[in-house]
From Swiss-Prot:
Function statement: Oxidizes L-tryptophan to 5-hydroxy-l-tryptophan in the rate-determining step of serotonin biosynthesis.
Boundaries of every ACT domain copy: 19-94
Gene Ontology cellular-component annotations: cytosol; neuron projection
Gene Ontology biological process terms in this record: aromatic amino acid metabolic process; bone remodeling; mammary gland alveolus development; platelet degranulation; positive regulation of fat cell differentiation; regulation of hemostasis; serotonin biosynthetic process
Binding positions for L-tryptophan per the UniProt entry: Y235, R257, T265, S336, I366
Species of the source: Homo sapiens
Modification after translation, per record: Ubiquitinated, leading to its degradation by the proteasome. Ubiquitinated is triggered by phosphorylation. Phosphorylated; triggering degradation by the proteasome.
Subunit structure: Homotetramer. Interacts with DNAJC12.
InterPro entries, sorted: ACT-like_dom_sf (IPR045865), ACT_dom (IPR002912), ArAA_hydroxylase (IPR001273), ArAA_hydroxylase_Fe/CU_BS (IPR018301), ArAA_hydroxylase_sf (IPR036951), Aro-AA_hydroxylase_C_sf (IPR036329), Aromatic-AA_hydroxylase_C (IPR019774), Trp_5_mOase (IPR005963)
Protein name: Tryptophan 5-hydroxylase 1
């Protein structure tokens, strides 16, 4: 045993030359914090370069070449993952990164508080708007956007979501969207949506003259399906967004689209989140469908995550379903867009049956109508098809969500799988006992 430990220690101290590329926001002190991680782990840096990110104008990419041992590299890799976006790691031939005894997999949150490490990796921050954004030249709007972004960036798991006093202009914009969409919902939205929307009006203040507070909405969802809301400053990467769903956490923007064009937004805003997503997150079957996509993404390859994100896009965002022999909408992108909601059920839109193997290859369009929409027989049908599809995703482990600790159980060996089976057996015993009692009950 001692010899084994010595061998493992020697193995972990093998040295080599490795290079890493990670991205940082262009802010004072960002690089110093990242390099301090190398210093604290006593890693010798051989070369450092910086360049402006080709993907995001507000970020810089840092290239680091270093002399490092296996143990140091594992530590630094996971510390950097918590503070930066690690783009690539070039390892010596004799190195492999390991985590909990597994071959290298992309970092993913193991407990709900770990979302603090990835919820702020937004693609745009605050007042950083593209030139074609309706609010690009509006300094007052940009300042307001930064206010909402700062609220989200300062949020930590367990905090109450700050209450916001919305401006008259924001409420008017919300009201315009709310009024027009509610004219279409009875003939376009699925029955589950129509069932939950009145409950949100009753318990969360969904009204034309009132923008609901995220804290109230989050508390409502917790009681209905166990989902909660977490404020976010803007777009997240597919991996970071889907990882939240694994914990039944929905990352939700709080800002309102620009008033100059209330029927268009190039990005998700609170109208999209609250009117498009929330009513169906209050539906148990749909909530389960969303969480299972999130769980499938944990530790998956970039290619697999992209496929899952595309399936999410064409179901949760732009999905159609059949009800009473007619097409109905359950996708949030459609339920929050007056023009595309009309178009999707106009009879002129191209519609195909939902098949994840085909859907995952379809191009996602952001600023125009989709070229095609996918229709599911039901949420259960979509869920079963996604379950079969996720079996094709290669991971050296399985995952199971523990709702009591709000953490992820990694099923990677006999011990962890046996533990999960014992929990399942207990649940089956409870159900079997209940069935036995019901069957013995005399009929009236």
């Amino acid at each position: 045993m001692i010899e084994d430990n010595k061998e493992n220690k020697d193995h972990s101290l093998e040295r080599g030359r490795a290079s890493l590329i990670f991205s940082l926001k262009n802010e004072v002190g960002g690089l110093i914090k990242a390099l301090k991680i190398f210093q604290e782990k006593h890693v010798n840096l051989l070369h450092i370069e910086s360049r402006k990110s080709k993907r995001r104008n507000s970020e810089f990419e840092i290239f680091v070449d270093c002399d490092i041992n296996r143990e140091q590299l594992n530590d630094i890799f996971h510390l950097l993952k918590s503070h930066t976006n690690v783009l690539s790691v070039n390892l010596p031939d004799n190195f492999t990164l390991k985590e909990d005894g597994m071959e290298t997999v992309p970092w993913f949150p193991k407990k709900i508080s770990d979302l603090d490490h990835c919820a702020n990796r937004v693609l745009m921050y605050g007042s950083e708007l593209d030139a074609d954004h309706p609010g690009f030249k509006d300094n007052v709007y940009r300042k307001r956007r930064k206010y909402f972004a700062d609220l989200a960036m300062n949020y930590k798991h367990g905090d109450p979501i700050p209450k916001v006093e919305f401006t008259e202009e924001e409420i008017k914009t919300w009201g315009t969207v709310f009024q027009e969409l509610n004219k279409l919902y009875p003939t376009h939205a699925c029955r589950e949506y129509l069932k939950n929307l009145p409950l949100l009006s009753k318990y969360c203040g969904y009204r034309e003259d009132n923008i609901p507070q995220l804290e109230d909405v989050s508390n409502f969802l917790k009681e209905r399906t166990g989902f909660s809301i977490r404020p976010v400053a803007g777009y997240l990467s597919p991996r970071d967004f889907l990882s939240g769903l694994a914990f039944r956490v929905f990352h939700c923007t709080q800002y309102v689209r620009h008033s100059s064009d209330p029927f268009y937004t190039p990005e998700p805003d609170t109208c999209h989140e609250l009117l498009g997503h929330v009513p169906l997150l209050a539906e148990p079957s749909f909530a389960q469908f969303s969480q299972e996509i999130g769980l499938a993404s944990l530790g998956a390859s970039e290619e697999a995550v992209q496929k899952l994100a595309t399936c999410y896009f064409f179901t949760v965002e732009f999905g159609l379903c059949k009800q009473d022999g007619q097409l109905r909408v359950f996708g949030a992108g459609l339920l929050s867009s007056i023009s595309e909601l009309k178009h999707a059920l106009s009879g002129h839109a191209k519609v195909k049956p939902f098949d994840p193997k085909i859907t995952c290859k379809q191009e996602c369009l952001i600023t125009t109508f989709q070229d095609v929409y996918f229709v599911s027989e039901s949420f259960e049908d979509a869920k079963e098809k996604m379950r079969e599809f996720t079996k094709t995703i290669k991971r050296p482990f399985g995952v199971k969500y523990n709702p009591y600790t709000r953490s992820i159980q990694i099923l990677k060996d006999t011990k962890s799988i046996t533990s999960a089976m014992n929990e399942l057996q207990h649940d089956l015993d409870v159900v079997s006992d209940a069935l036995a009692k019901v069957s013995r009950k005399p009929s009236i």
